[in-house]
Amino acid sequence: MAHMAATVRVIGSPAYPVSEKLLYQRIEAALQRGSCPEGVARQMVAIAASGERTTLLPSISCPALVIHGAADPLIPVACGIDTAALIPGARLEVIEGMGHDMPPQLIERLLALIDVHLQGKMAPQMRSQPA
């Protein structure tokens, strides 16, 4: 658990720190859902071996919302900007102070962004009607 906590501290959001207690509670909950070190290793190899995919982004035809942390130490914000620019009609939201995580302090904001995106992009007949 200490290694996982250290990783979260490195990639986490500098403007939205979480307490040690909450950090360990979240790690414990994740471990209780399941842990597969071999699966993580396979995923890392797959990421490294997947190669360049930006040429595929212009072929995305569904509405896209790109949310990227301005303080992401793992994937530079320029990559999020490029991703949104390459997807036709994509909307970009750069969150100041956010790293490569979803801090509890931002969950409401992230959910609101996703909700607005989905409500605005769904066909009118698919939206739920008030009772």
Kindly give the residue locations of the regions a language model identified.
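Alpha/beta-hydrolase
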Residues: M1-T55, C62
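Hydrophobic/aromatic residue at the end of a short beta strand that borders the catalytic acidic motif
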Residues: T7, I75, M102
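Short, conserved loop/helix-junction motifs that constitute active-site signature segments
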Residues: P58-I60, L86-I87
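Conserved alpha/beta-hydrolase "acid-adjacent" motif
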Residues: P73-C79
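Short beta-strand/loop motif that positions the catalytic acidic residue
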Residues: I60, V66-H68, D72
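Catalytic active-site module of serine/aspartate enzymes centered on a nucleophile-bearing elbow/loop
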Residues: A90-A131
